[in-house]
From Swiss-Prot:
Modified residues (N6-(pyridoxal phosphate)lysine): 699
Keywords on record: Oxidoreductase, Pyridoxal phosphate
Keyword Cytoplasm listed: no
Molecular function, one GO term: glycine dehydrogenase (decarboxylating) activity
Cofactor(s) it depends on: pyridoxal 5'-phosphate
Known function: The glycine cleavage system catalyzes the degradation of glycine. The P protein binds the alpha-amino group of glycine through its pyridoxal phosphate cofactor; CO(2) is released and the remaining methylamine moiety is then transferred to the lipoamide cofactor of the H protein.
Cellular component per GO, a single term: cytosol
Subunit structure: The glycine cleavage system is composed of four proteins: P, T, L and H.
Record-given protein name: Glycine dehydrogenase (decarboxylating)
Similarity field: Belongs to the GcvP family.
Stored InterPro entries: GcvP, GDC-P_C, GDC-P_N, GDC_P, PyrdxlP-dep_Trfase, PyrdxlP-dep_Trfase_major, PyrdxlP-dep_Trfase_small
Keyword DNA damage: no
Gene: gcvP
Record GO biological process: glycine decarboxylation via glycine cleavage system
């Protein structure tokens, strides 16, 4: 841990919700003499950590910001004109302050409960509309992790949808290098072959199920891709176009060119580069492919009154439903970044975006004219914002001169240089570039002779962003109010506890968020020279050391951009390990029936065959079934994927035995780290038999969920798997046996690592351990209070749960017809987000309070649940029919209380202000219960005027 001089202060006290007095009272309620006694009952003694964490004392908030300023000072955010899909951009201050820095936006969860998510669902609907308009395609999803993984998802979609039987995919030689590398990683375990070449000449002889084409190309060239797209389609394959959104304001859209799929990044729409992320990628498809689209899709439906309402559509496509049949494991997306990019488009409108694009292109054309005059005519005669020049033997000299001007260029191995201009480029930037090449010209002297580098037959003729939302909020006052109106519709952690099991919705402290927007962290290009990112590398080194101490592993990769991507990287490491030992035939992955849907989906993507292991009556892995299947598949056993504590909310007693069984049959143990919030400081996966885990930094380590992303899923491994961690073409320290990259950037979404770094630094060893203990206490307290009303389904042999618990209302459904959906929607009337519904056990609710919630908030939640149970008793007694009850009519809106006619058997007050809820601080749900079936039957995923649907519903 970093040395410090001042004594520790009390950040941990502010992070942990219950006071010492509250903890004592809660311990009495659960019947434990102390926190340590409770831990001894909740955790098996065989896994308890033998030595304490070695992280030192926690820093104060003032101290940690001073420390972060020192790290930031080690970074050098030069003007990076490297390109490759990353551009300098301006995040409008009104969006930075009111979305990126606003907990109403960044502390929200994924909008699975649409009634309390209408604000961000509308913002995502705007994002989808923006993508559809610019790409000219019919349906767009609500973001993916980055452009490279979006390309990999598109390849998988093409393979699934194509009528071609071949297993080869064509990759344009103009695709960004990191995209090609990620495509190789994705293709290899699935037995797919990549064919690279010039699509305008090489496609005729290629037998492929699809192709990805870069538009404009990585060199900057702008080509007419229509012949290539026609050639792909003539073979029965699918055409994927990786397109620059800003360029599409001036260029013919991929849809008009004939593409089936468009992918790319929305980073340059207001999202800082952040040394690699996070950024929102996109995917748009033609209408015929909409049911194969990976990730989340926002659609328009109606509520119980027929009022238009947004919701997540076609969820049966997603990994948590399809499981091992899924072709994608996408779970976390990049919602917060997609919202920022959509607001950037709302802020500028189509005219503003086109003006930015024209300015960038004018600077590019002027730069090209000057370079041509100097004898460095660009190799690409067409361009939007990027030029490639042959510098030959002068390459290093020019790079050095540019660096002295504060500019980074793209250095290519063939002696060429890439120059990618952006929104931040000004005339002085162009003049500085000329100086690097040896001239001292005035911009004005050259501009008049600059040609138009956009091909005339590729200039855009179709309108975009025609919906009123992209025209009505041009003044800051109007935009400010629009963003406030949307955030007021949502329920996030800034309003109330979000008790979602397996999601760890803990405090995202303000101090943890502050350095994120500092220029020294935000404005670094991921492929900038490493010496310009020394502050980041110091952070990486410290952070990895801390995670190793916390987990008991020997090596860490920070590259995965989500927990699901961490799973994928970990399984690839296992696959690489077996291959290196001459055991490539080991492809069976054992997965308990209770596993999160990403587990089987990730195994499928890694080329493994999923074999399901049963769970016993206690919810634990059935060890006898595990032993049977391990023996049955001993020759082919690759791994087991197991979550610990289990998804049933219990520390399984036989975890060491489970690991030993798998190891004894030649397999490796992948321990899903989704529930690591119950282990930090108490137990370490690397000590009790696990070989690899991912860590959800957006759960245990305080990166906010952002309404559905960003996330981070670094993986820890034991020493024998370390050589197989993901590499990256941009860094040269990877081992020869490293698997390929799983993310576009070498360190994933590096900028948000600052959040988790600060959390660990402020909590220190004792604070982190106390957080874990209180998380377990809070869950046991809720279990104790609710069990007389809603039975707790699973406990360990000593009657304890881990950091979450499952309550079981299924008997009540059988008796009264009340569903978990009814309970979830009724909780909204009490001002709460619902617990996790029907996972891992259908018809149940899984509750995780985290350590950050106070006893008062826990009691408020328990009181609400008990009051709901009393309402169910009214149905049991026959005083209400379920169809006429407040549970079935929930959530109640302001429209309900204002109804002239009230014919329900309960009063307005009972419906809208249920027992124990506050009238003065009431959260009013903006819509009634959303009709999911209607939304899927009448799929609308981008916006004509919303009023059209209101009229249609009447």
């Amino acid at each position: 841990m970093i040395a410090r001089e001042e004594p520790a202060t009390t950040f941990a006290r502010r992070h942990i919700g219950p006071s010492s007095r509250d903890i004592a009272a809660m311990l009495e309620t659960v019947g434990a003499k102390s926190l340590e006694a409770l831990m001894n009952e909740a955790l098996p003694p065989s896994i308890r950590q033998k030595t304490p964490l070695d992280l030192g004392e926690g820093f104060s908030e003032t101290e940690v910001l001073t420390h972060m300023q020192a790290l930031a000072a080690q970074n050098q955010p030069l003007t990076s004109l490297i390109g490759q899909g990353y551009s300098g951009t301006i995040l409008p201050a009104v969006i930075q302050r009111n979305i990126l820095e606003n907990p109403a936006w960044y502390t929200a969860y994924t909008p699975y409960q649409p009634e309390i998510s209408q604000g961000r669902l509308e913002a995502l609907f705007n994002f989808q509309t923006m993508i559809c308009d610019l790409t000219g395609l019919d349906v767009a999803n609500a973001s993916l992790l980055d452009e490279a993984t979006a390309a990999a998802e598109a390849m998988a979609l093409a393979e699934r949808a194509s009528s071609v039987k071949t297993k080869a995919f064509f990759v344009d030689h103009e695709v960004h290098p990191q995209t090609l590398a990620v495509l190789r990683t994705r293709a290899e375990p699935l037995g797919w072959t990549l064919v690279t070449g010039d699509p305008l000449h090489d496609l005729d002889k290629a037998d492929v199920f699809g192709a990805v084409l870069q538009y404009p190309g990585t060199s900057g060239v702008v080509r007419d891709l229509r012949p290539a797209i026609a050639a792909i389609k003539a073979k029965g394959g699918l055409a994927v176009v990786a397109a620059d959104l800003l360029a599409l304001t001036l260029l013919t859209s991929p849809g008009v060119l004939g593409a089936d799929i468009a992918i790319g990044s929305a980073q340059r729409f207001g999202v800082p580069m952040g040394y690699g992320g996070p950024h929102a990628a996109y995917m748009a498809v033609c209408n015929a492919l909409k049911r194969l689209l990976p990730g989340r899709l926002v659609g328009l439906s109606v509520d119980s009154r027929g009022t238009p309402a947004y919701r997540l559509a076609l969820q049966t496509r997603e990994q948590h439903i399809r499981r091992e049949k899924a072709t994608s494991n996408i779970c976390t997306a990049q919602v917060l970044l997609a919202v920022i990019s959509s607001m950037y488009a709302v802020y500028h409108g189509p005219e503003g975006l086109a003006q930015i694009a024209r300015t960038v292109h004018r600077h590019t054309a002027t730069l090209a004219a000057g370079l041509t005059r100097l004898g460095f005519a660009p190799l690409n005669s067409t361009a939007f914002d990027t030029l490639t020049v042959n510098a030959g033997e002068r390459q290093s000299e020019i790079v050095k001169r540019a660096s002295s001007q504060g500019i980074n260029l793209r250095i290519n191995a063939d002696g060429t240089l890439g120059i990618a201009l952006d929104e931040l480029t000004i005339e002085e930037t162009v003049e500085a570039l000329w100086r690097a090449f040896g001239a001292t010209w005035s911009y004005a002297d050259v501009e008049a002779h600059a040609p138009d580098l956009l091909p005339a037959d590729l200039k855009r003729k179709t309108a975009y962003l025609t919906h009123p939302v992209f025209h009505e909020h041009r003044s800051e006052t109007e935009l400010l109010r629009y963003m406030r109106k949307l955030s007021d519709r949502d329920l996030a952690l800034d309003r109330a506890m979000i008790p979602l099991g397996s999601c760890t919705m803990k405090l995202n402290a303000t101090t943890e968020m502050i350095p994120l927007t500092w220029a020294a962290f935000a404005n670094l290009h991921p492929f900038a020279p490493p010496e310009q990112a020394e502050g980041y590398f110091t952070l990486f080194e410290n952070f990895e050391e801390w995670l190793l101490d916390i987990t008991g592993y020997d090596a860490i990769s920070l590259q995965p951009n989500s927990g699901a991507q961490g799973e994928y990287a970990g399984l690839l490491a296992i696959r690489g390990y077996h291959a290196a030992r001459g055991e490539s035939h080991r492809t069976v992955c054992l997965i308990p029936s209770s596993a999160h849907g990403t587990n089987p989906a990730s195994a499928n993507m890694a080329g493994m065959d999923v074999v399901v292991v049963a769970c016993d009556a206690r919810g634990d892995v059935d060890v006898d079934d595990l032993r049977t299947k391990s023996t049955q598949h001993a020759d082919r056993l690759a791994a087991i994927m197991i979550t610990y504590p289990s998804t049933h909310g219990v520390f399984e007693e036989r975890i060491r035995e489970i690991c030993d069984i798998v190891h004894g049959h030649g397999g490796q143990v992948y321990l899903d780290g989704a529930n690591m919030n119950a282990q930090v400081g108490l137990s370490r996966p690397g000590d009790y038999g696990a070989d690899v885990s991912h860590l959800n930094l957006h759960k245990t380590f305080c990166i906010p969920h952002g309404g559905g992303g960003p996330g981070m899923g670094p993986i820890g491994v034991k020493a024998h798997l370390a050589p197989f961690l993901p590499g990256h073409p941009a860094i040269d320290d990877a081992t020869p046996s490293a698997v390929g990259p799983v993310s576009a950037a070498p360190f994933g979404s590096a900028s948000i690592l600052t959040i988790s770094y600060i959390y660990i630094l402020m909590m220190g060893s004792e604070g982190l351990k106390r957080a874990t203990e209180v998380a377990i206490l809070n869950a046991n307290y809720i279990a104790q209070r609710l069990d007389p009303h809603f039975p707790v389904l699973y406990r360990n042999v000593k009657g304890r749960v881990a950091h979450e618990c499952i309550i079981d209302p299924r008997a009540l459904k059988a008796k009264t017809g009340v569903t978990v959906d009814d309970i979830a929607k009724r909780l909204i009337d009490y001002g709460f987000h619902a617990p996790t519904m029907s996972f891992p056990v259908p018809g149940t609710l899984m509750i995780e309070p985290t350590e950050s919630e106070s006893k008062a908030e826990l009691d408020r939640f328990c009181d609400a649940m008990i009051a709901i149970r009393q309402e169910i008793a009214e149905i049991e007694a026959g005083r209400w029919k379920v169809e006429a009850s407040p549970l079935r009519h929930a959530p109640h809106t302001a429209h309900d209380i204002a109804d002239d006619a009230w014919s329900r058997p309960y009063s307005r007050a009972q419906g809208c202000f249920p027992s124990g809820s506050s009238r003065s601080d009431k959260y009013w749900c903006p819509v009634g219960r959303v009709d999911n079936a209607y939304g899927d039957r009448n799929l609308v995923c981008s916006c004509p005027p919303v009023e059209d649907y209101a009229q249609a519903a009447e």
